[in-house]
């Protein structure tokens, strides 16, 4: 059993170690654990301030600036403006300096799934067939790739994001900020049910009323029926560390035997889910395709709608009136259409084909109507997330600047009151910043080339750039 180092634990350091590393020996019931802990040594030449000069600065919300500069002090953006207007106190301080062609906020993907499933399975059975340890290993790689590709934040809407976020936050692995729902909530015979397996098998693993001794209840799905079960389901996700609650409010594509046009959960169940989430200062994100599910989710008070395939003018006006975020997830549809449904069971492929055109029309209509939109792909960490920017422009009808706003400034709205102060290059915001060698306003597909992302700062720390190792470490000393 591996445990974190406690401050009271005796420390033993090897004075001859060339790694400058402190070790902790901690006994437990299984073994004597030898753990490495970075030795932090104060340095008089340590950079206190980072100054980035940019030929073009895209703020996330607002017009781009030419010949601009941005100053990071610790983790916070301290100055944004003309290169000529940098306060002298920053120029006099100890600093690291970078000059880049294009600077902008780090990207968000607002609809991810931290499943880490085995590719051998092509339906929901993979969630039960894959060991969580294997899932975690795959997710660690994907999170590293995400940061290298310029994605500094993910919203996970069904998966192990709560658990992976802890490993990222304590520095065990490298990845974006992760804001997770924990398990997605589904009714029996709903979008989160696994129709290929016996009901007892599914409920025994994912049923909210069936926790086993020693079981964390930390799967990607949670089956609940009735107001008391859904109330408990919300509380269990918050116990895991969920920053948002995800509910399956209509049938879906990947669930083999349900109908995307039909609403799921009763109005009373949806109301309790929203109320219980609000009690803990969380919003609810609803998976919806058909209008019945869309309207039920809106009436219940859900603040983020996913897919929204059969939306119309009535829906768009209600979303604007109530300040509801629209996350279309066009990428997953385009990917399956291009591959002729490769990887889908026949029932899912038929459903996707049936709703693909309506989904696109709804997306285009929402953009024209002025609904607030954030971008999400419905894929996994490290996947082709930048495709969503391309489809927002080429299929949805956004301008490149609008697509960037949807992937940056609008994105924190997807976690409601739990949102960090990020997504924009503004003074006082967290320094989640990326640099590009090409102008995305001229070619939105530039985000699809990882080499085009030359620098990545997350929370003010440089994770990708000259002199930085592949895991965000100082290449001169990988343990600092």
From Swiss-Prot:
Location in the cell reads: Secreted
Q: What is its EC number?
A: 3.4.17.-
Cofactor(s) listed in the protein's UniProt record: Zn(2+)
pH-related activity info reads: Optimum pH is 6.
Q: Which InterPro entries match?
A: Amidohydro-rel, Metal-dep_hydrolase_composite, Metal_Hydrolase, Metallo-dep_Hydrolase
According to the UniProt entry, its GO molecular function terms are: carboxypeptidase activity; hydrolase activity, acting on carbon-nitrogen (but not peptide) bonds; metal ion binding; metallopeptidase activity
Summary of the protein's practical applications: Detoxification of contaminated food is a challenging health issue and ochratoxinase is a promising enzyme that hydrolyzes ochrtoxin A, a mycotoxin demonstrated to have nephrotoxic, immunotoxic, genotoxic, neurotoxic, and teratogenic properties; and that occurs in a wide range of agricultural products.
Taken from the UniProt entry, a GO cellular component term is: extracellular region
Q: Which reaction does it catalyse?
A: ochratoxin A + H2O = ochratoxin alpha + L-phenylalanine
The processes (GO biological process) annotated in the record are: proteolysis
UniProt KW keywords:
Carboxypeptidase, Hydrolase, Metal-binding, Metalloprotease, Protease, Secreted, Zinc
Question: Which sites are catalytic?
Answer: 246, 378
Activity regulation, short description:
The Zn(2+)-specific chelator 1,10-phenanthroline inhibits the enzyme activity.
Q: What is its main location?
A: secreted
CDD domains this protein is in? Met_dep_hydrolase_A (cd01299)
Instruction: Please tell me which top-level EC class this enzyme sits in.
Output: hydrolase
SUPFAM superfamilies in the record, alphabetically? Composite domain of metallo-dependent hydrolases, Metallo-dependent hydrolases
Q: Where are the transmembrane segments?
A: none
UniProt record similarity statement: Belongs to the metallo-dependent hydrolases superfamily. Ochratoxinase amidase 2 family.
- Primary role: Carboxypeptidase that catalyzes the release of a C-terminal amino acid with specific catalytic activity for aromatic amino acids such as phenylalanine. Is able to degrade ochratoxin A, one of the five major mycotoxins most harmful to humans and animals that is produced by Aspergillus and Penicillium species and occurs in a wide range of agricultural products.
Q: Give the multimer and partner information.
A: Homooctamer.
The free-text domain note is: Each subunit of the homooctameric enzyme folds into a two-domain structure characteristic of a metal dependent amidohydrolase, with a twisted TIM (triosephosphateisomerase)-barrel and a smaller beta-sandwich domain.
From the Swiss-Prot or TrEMBL record, give the protein name.
Ochratoxinase
Origin organism is: Aspergillus niger (strain ATCC 1015 / CBS 113.46 / FGSC A1144 / LSHB Ac4 / NCTC 3858a / NRRL 328 / USDA 3528.7)
**Source organism phylogeny:** Eukaryota, Fungi, Dikarya, Ascomycota, Pezizomycotina
């Amino acid at each position: 059993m591996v445990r974190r180092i406690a401050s009271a634990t005796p420390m033993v350091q090897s004075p001859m170690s060339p790694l400058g590393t402190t070790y902790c020996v901690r006994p437990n019931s299984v073994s004597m654990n030898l753990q490495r802990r970075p030795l932090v040594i104060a340095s008089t030449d340590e950079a206190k301030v980072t100054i980035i000069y940019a030929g073009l600065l895209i703020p996330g919300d607002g017009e781009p600036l030419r010949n601009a500069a941005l100053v990071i002090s610790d983790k916070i953006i301290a100055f944004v403006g003309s290169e000529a207007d940098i306060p002298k106190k920053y120029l006099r301080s100890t600093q690291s300096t970078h000059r880049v062609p294009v600077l902008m906020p780090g990207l968000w993907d607002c609809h991810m799934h931290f499943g880490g499933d085995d590719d051998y399975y092509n339906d929901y059975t993979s969630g039960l067939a894959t060991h969580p340890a294997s899932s975690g290993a795959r997710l660690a790689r994907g999170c590293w790739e995400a940061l290298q590709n310029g994605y500094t934040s993910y919203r996970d809407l069904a998966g192990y994001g709560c658990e992976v976020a802890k490993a990222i936050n304590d520095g065990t692995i490298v990845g974006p900020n992760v804001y997770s729902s924990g398990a997605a909530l589904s009714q029996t015979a709903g979008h989160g049910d696994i129709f290929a397996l016996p009901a007892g098998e599914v409920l025994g693993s994912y049923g909210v009323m069936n926790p086993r001794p020693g079981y964390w209840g930390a799967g990607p799905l949670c089956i609940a029926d009735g107001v008391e079960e859904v109330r408990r389901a919300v509380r269990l996700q918050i116990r895991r560390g969920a920053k948002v609650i995800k509910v399956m409010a209509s049938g879906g594509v990947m669930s083999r035997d349900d109908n995307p046009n039909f609403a799921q959960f009763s109005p009373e169940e949806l109301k309790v889910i929203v109320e219980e989430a609000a009690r803990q200062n969380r919003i609810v994100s609803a998976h919806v395709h058909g209008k019945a599910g869309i309207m039920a989710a809106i009436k219940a008070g859900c603040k983020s709608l996913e897919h929204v395939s059969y939306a119309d003018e009535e829906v768009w006006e209600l979303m604007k009136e109530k300040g509801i975020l629209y996350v279309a997830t066009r990428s997953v549809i385009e990917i399956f259409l291009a591959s002729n449904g490769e990887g889908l069971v026949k029932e899912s492929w038929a459903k996707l084909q049936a709703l693909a055109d309506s989904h696109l029309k709804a997306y285009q209509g929402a953009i024209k109507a002025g609904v607030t939109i954030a971008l999400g792909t419905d894929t996994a960490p490290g996947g082709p997330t930048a495709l969503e920017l391309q489809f927002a422009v080429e299929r949805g009808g956004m301008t490149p600047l609008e697509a960037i706003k949807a992937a940056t400034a609008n994105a924190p709205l997807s976690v409601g009151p739990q949102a960090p102060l990020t997504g924009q290059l503004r003074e006082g915001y967290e320094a989640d910043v990326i640099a590009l060698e090409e102008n995305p306003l001229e070619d939105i597909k530039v985000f699809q080339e990882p080499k085009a992302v030359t620098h990545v700062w997350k929370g003010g720390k440089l994770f990708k750039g000259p002199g930085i190792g592949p895991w965000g470490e100082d290449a001169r000393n990988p343990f600092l």
